[in-house]
């Protein structure tokens, strides 16, 4: 039994809680620095030549589950451990402290009052009147008072004692919500062209929701850099009701039936071109990260040089489209919707560049618990600021003295500044 109590004491200790918080904060920082949720090959390729911190390569990142920190077993273990520690601490320390704070403490000897942090002695002629005036003054100032014929016990701000347990309770809710989201949450990221749609299928095979991209627009700064992405989406849930149309943008997601739909990214997915008298051709574009973060392109056959190819690259929907020989020499540039240029002996025209919107769809059943936990933690933190004050007054008939004293769990100097007012009331009797 002693071993069990030692284990419980250790689990609920402040040192362990601080250590766990440190490791959780460190893990969260790692999850910020290392991209989360990418393909395994991306980690292996990106960290092959340049390991993270000079030590951790892609294989080690995958082995340590650093590619999905917040749903990794060790991170969930830390959250569970902290939650258990908080529950044990609340049960063994916070709850008994709260119960003790709710009990009235009755001092019936002057020596007890003299030992308090703040204490005074006042000579009074009419003890009954002094006790009554002090009682009325405390009541009017919001104190909870218990009075007897020759003594008073009063307290104020007891609600502040509920703060620490509420903070613990809120943090436990937060961790339960975070764990539930990590275990049961799902996310889907999809690039859609205007007119295209995505069907979200429930586990039982029933089509729950259809999301269709009606329009996509990129707002750019004068220097051509993207400033904002706007997607007009249409949602239908299979019912007979009219589809719902909404607009989403970066930092302005859409919440619908427990899902959160984000405007996450953008891309160039295709290009419409015409070669000579050919019909309009739609060619797919692929990202070329070797040439830059936002560069897309396609390889075209070089009709003038058998076995060789021409590289078309483009970085925005407004162009220009750049053409390079296989040796890397620039051939020409064509603006979408602009003039034709001769390439491979053919008049070549770039008619239009097709954009696609990066839609991120998240389902996180733990979000309500996280919000509730945050609200409880915030309320508990605010309540904890309230200082709990206690005051006692005792009249001794044999020497005609009224002893008055008090204590406070915080802001004792502020409480001491209130004492002259109480003494003035007593002396006026």
Curated annotation (Swiss-Prot):
Pfam families: ResB. GO terms for biological process: cytochrome complex assembly. GO terms for cellular component: plasma membrane-derived thylakoid membrane. The chain crosses the membrane at residues 14-34, 72-92, 162-182. It is found in: Cellular thylakoid membrane. It is a multi-pass membrane protein. Keywords: Cytochrome c-type biogenesis, Membrane, Thylakoid, Transmembrane, Transmembrane helix. Its main location: membrane. Required during biogenesis of c-type cytochromes (cytochrome c6 and cytochrome f) at the step of heme attachment. Belongs to the Ccs1/CcsB family. May interact with CcsA. This is Cytochrome c biogenesis protein CcsB. The gene is ccsB.
